[in-house]
Amino acid sequence: DAKVGDTVTLTVNGKTFTGQVQADKTFSINVPGADLVADAGKTINASISTTDAAGNVGTGTASEGYSVDVTAPVPTITLDANITADDVINSTEAGQQIPVTGTVGGDAKVGDTVTLTVNGKQFTGQVQADKTFSINVPGADLVADAGKTINASISTTDAAGNIGTGTASEGYSVDVTAPVPTISLDANITADDVINSTE
């Protein structure tokens, strides 16, 4: 017997929140998440009151339980110690794409996004089935980075929608100065520095 415009009252955490029945016999009432978390019984109690043409008042009630999980996941991330064989970017590597690799753990999941920040730019990749990642970073950006440090982060979301982030950083060196070899010829190419007919 509920009618459009009847008042619906929700009770959560000892507080009441009201709304009206809509034309399609539904209702939608905003409840602060903080009150849902704080409610001791984790139960929403609902009631509706309606009055008929004769002035009789009727009330209906219902309740619905729910769960709370506000604990963020804790992913971890580790960058491999050397980004090249010797952990030094040389002049050749400065012109290449350098694969930066590492592993994740904790609550990190396959498919989570890993973000590397180098030279103020971000480069992203996904966690693979073996909990590793490999992300190409231009050697030029590794050379240009003022701190010569790769900053890595991973973000993961649990089943309840909580978001957790893990971070790590790894330094490296740059040497793009070409070696300068020297060579000298002996002053005399023969004993007297003269090529004769025999020589």
Provide a role label for each language-model segment.
Residues 1-199:
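Extracellular glycosylation-rich, acidic/polar low-complexity regions of adhesion-
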